[in-house]
Design a protein with these regions (language model features):
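A cross-family signal for N-terminal binding/gating loops and helix N-caps
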Residues: 1-290
Length: 292
């Protein structure tokens, strides 16, 4: 299957650089046997009592930091994940890659580049990387949003159901940005069960697919946790003939990874699951994707 088969034209004027005041007033396209153009709040009409809605409760780290190399050249550091108490795996954008053993200055803080791992770099900090990025980091807006991050993004580039103790993602699970508390309560009152999984969205989510054939793409790995209780909820939902709705590709990747194991006892670890046309879904019946 050619990667070019997935190309399409997206005019820049159709990209919303700022969110609407009301999360659930965003536009919603529904594809089944027909295509409908609705508002996101209308998604409630597609749920039935006994269905299951699965959310990714991850929280976003302000994962982008700007600084300079020892030579004075500018540098951009994008956190991928924390490796140890004071070490992190990062992407680096610069005219020239930093040398192993060299220092990088981030907002007057000196960190050391101590190694490489494929296209990523390993940096050593003098304290917790999460603490540092929370203090001086910028919200990592998607590359298609052509503006600097602002204070409002710390709130709006996050879901209303995020778990602050799960601050482990460098990008938001964007399909969930359009649920507000009122809509979630209405869905719950309709008799829909709600479950959460956790998948740490990595910087690889921003990497383009360069392989000529989609099957040859080396997709990035991500850490996830799906509890045995959530697996049981999925199994019970299907047993009753009801539907499992996953909010976004991250929740989908988490659930489908958990159901790759025949024991179906939950999953905790890294996944490289790559879903493309032809994949047979084991857990998810309905998928809610990114919305405009």
């Amino acid at each position: 299957m050619k990667t070019s088969d997935f190309n399409y034209h997206l005019p820049e004027k159709l990209i919303a650089n700022y969110p609407l005041n009301s999360r659930s007033s965003s536009r919603l396209l529904v594809q089944s046997t027909t295509i409908e153009h609705l508002l996101f709040k209308d998604i409630i009409n597609f749920f039935q009592q006994g269905d299951l809605l699965v959310l990714n409760n991850t929280s976003v780290i302000p994962a982008r930091v700007f600084g300079n190399k020892e030579s004075g050249g500018s540098i951009e550091v994008m956190l991928e994940r924390v490796l140890e108490e004071n070490k992190a795996l990062v992407q680096i954008r610069s005219g020239r890659s930093p040398k192993i053993g060299s220092n990088i200055i981030l907002n007057s803080l000196i960190v050391k580049c101590i190694g490489r791992q494929d296209s990523f770099f390993i940096l050593q900090f003098d304290r917790s990387p999460i603490e540092i990025f929370n203090a001086i980091g910028h919200v990592p807006l998607p590359p298609y949003i052509k503006r600097p991050d602002e204070e409002l993004d710390r709130h709006r580039y996050a879901t209303v159901y995020e778990d602050k103790t799960q601050q482990d993602s460098v990008a938001a699970p964007t399909a969930g940005l359009h649920f507000d508390n009122t809509l979630l309560e209405l869905i719950k009152n309709k008799g829909v069960n709600i479950a959460t999984v956790n998948l740490s969205v990595g910087a690889g989510t921003f990497q383009p697919v360069k392989a000529e054939n989609i099957e040859e793409h080396d997709i990035h790995s991500e850490y996830l946790e799906v509890t045995p209780e959530v697996v049981d909820m999925v199994l019970e939902t299907k047993k009753k003939g009801k539907k499992v709705f996953a909010v976004g590709t991250t929740a989908t990747r988490a659930l489908e990874t958990a159901f790759m194991d025949e024991s179906k006892k939950g999953f905790c670890g890294y996944t490289k699951l790559f879903i493309y046309p032809g994949y047979k879904f084991k857990a998810v019946d309905r998928l809610s994707l990114i919305h405009i």
